[in-house]
Regions:
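Short, glycine/polar-rich helix-capping loops at beta-to-alpha or helix-loop-helix junctions
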Residues: 122-129
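Mid-chain, well-packed structural core segment of small domains
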Residues: 104-116
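Amphipathic coiled-coil/heptad-repeat helices and related helical stalk/stem segments
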Residues: 99-101, 124
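Non-catalytic interface/targeting segments
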Residues: 2-98, 141, 146-156
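Short alpha-helix boundary/capping motifs
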Residues: 97, 120-121
Length: 156
């Protein structure tokens, strides 16, 4: 049953490990197989803000979409964003400048491969600098959360 659930996105198993403080998580899902970061960026109409060629071709194995303001105020364990693997994309919505998510990621020992800002107001230079320092691909998209989920379901 666990393997079947995992093969279909892992929602049931993920919900078994869910915490009361995960109201910030809009969606979390694992992919059946790895997908190159470039494919994901193309599918969500993303614009790369930071990241070099060798990182862009690496695979990711899932994603998490999170409300950045709720995450800052409700998460006790930042690692709850990672699901089965940190080789994933973390989407942050409600981003104004992009500093807070990148500072939180920098402070945590486990890093995602990709950070994607959903409809950010603007991106501060500090956010891109932190992404470069941590070797994280930083992307922005104008897709909303529903559009992102619809597109990413194709990867399963």
């Amino acid at each position: 049953m666990v393997e079947y659930d995992k093969a279909h996105g892992g929602k049931i198993v993920s919900s078994m490990f869910a915490k009361d403080n995960n109201s910030a998580v809009y969606d979390i899902r694992e992919f059946n197989t790895g997908t190159p970061i470039t494919n994901l960026i193309q599918e969500i109409g993303g614009e790369i803000l930071s990241g070099n060629e060798d990182i862009l071709e690496r695979p990711i194995y899932g994603y998490t979409i999170v409300d950045s303001l709720k995450a800052i105020t409700t998460f006790n364990v930042f690692g709850d964003l990672y699901g089965w693997s940190n080789e994933r994309a973390i989407f942050f919505s409600g981003v104004h400048y992009g500093r807070s998510p990148m500072i939180a990621i920098r402070a945590h020992p486990v890093k995602p491969r990709v950070v994607i800002y959903v409809k950010p107001k603007t991106i501060d230079k500090l956010a891109t600098k932190l992404a470069e320092m941590e070797r994280i691909v930083l992307v922005k998209t104008e897709f909303d959360e529903e559009e992102i989920v619809t597109v990413l379901k194709k990867f399963n």
